[in-house]
Structure formats: structure tokens, C-alpha cells
Amino acid sequence: VLLALVGCGSATVGGGGSPARAKWVGSVVRTPDGGQLRTTIYYGPWQCSAAFLVRCESKCAAQGYPLMGCMWLADIKGDWQGRYLFMPAEAGGRLAITHCCCDYPKVSDGKWRRDTWKNSRNAFRDEWGREFGGWPSTGGVNWQGHHIFDLRHGGAPVARDNVLPVPDDVHGVLNREYPACYAPGGQWLKPGPERPYVD
């Protein structure tokens, strides 16, 4: 279920570092197998680990672009409880949400991409909420939908694996840091720790 959310993620293990910038704990959702799933999202951004940087470098090179930087945006943690072979069981895992800032050209249809998101976001949030337990909000105001592969460089406006709910303050940080990730020689090209935050 979680792997369908973001195809560019990878499994991570919680660990050291400072607390995440923000955290969202979803409500319990029933799974098709009769179990229960709770989703938790930990928000950065953090510098990518050396392994993530190598993976991003390969991804960019395969598309014919140099890597300018890599941002580790969030970790999505899933905790499942149910039954396996008629016995109670628990399982879980984490998925790192990263963005490879390849030296993509800026697109000319940015307005169309923004308008497409604006016109589709309510339906997108409803669909996301059915799977993960409600689109996050604060004081009745929905959190922003952050485009992992940004619209300015060609990201898909309503692709399931390209939009992540983020609180307003984190969204502001991400929007400030994305241009730095695409700029040459910045901090986002330097490797960070394997586990940048604590639960």
C-alpha cells in the first residue's frame, strides 16, 4: 500500500539525529486483508544520504542531466496489525521520500500545471484520505499538497506518487530550498547521515 504512494522512495530505518521538523499521525485505516494500518509521516527536509545521492546521480545521468542536488523530504512509516496464519501479527516499514534535483530545464506550461492541480486538488485529497485516513489539516484548514517533482521542472500535477501533504511551515521551507537544490554547488549535493532524525 505504501509503495504505491511514492515510487521514488526507498526503505529507511529510523534512528539518530534531531527530531523531525514536523510529524503527522494518521487515523487507523482498515486494510483489504481485515487488518489495520496507521500511517505516520516525518518531515524534513534533510540532506540525502550518500546512497541516495548515488542513486540520484544514476537517475539523472540516465536522463542525460547532471545531478545538482538531492533532498530527503519526508519519511512515511506504516504500522500494520492483523492476522497471519490465524495468529495475531504486526509489521511495518518506512519509505524515504526523496527528490533528485537533476538539471532539468524549466517547462513552458507551468500555468497549465498549476491550474490542473488547483482544479483537481479536492478530488485528489479525498482519494488520498480514503487510503491513508484523511488529508491532514490544522484548525479545519487543509495542509498544502507539495509536488515532490516540482511543477516548474515538469512534475505531474496530480500523479499519486508526486503529491505529499505538508504543513504550511514545512511547505514554506521546501519552496525556499528547492531553488537551492537546483543551483550548482549547494548544500544539497553534500551527503547527509543515513538516519537524519529520531522518532
Per-region residue spans from a language model:
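Nuclease and nuclease-like effector domains acting on nucleic acids or nucleotide cofactors
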Residues: 8-144, 149-199
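Bacterial N-terminal signal peptides
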Residues: 1-7
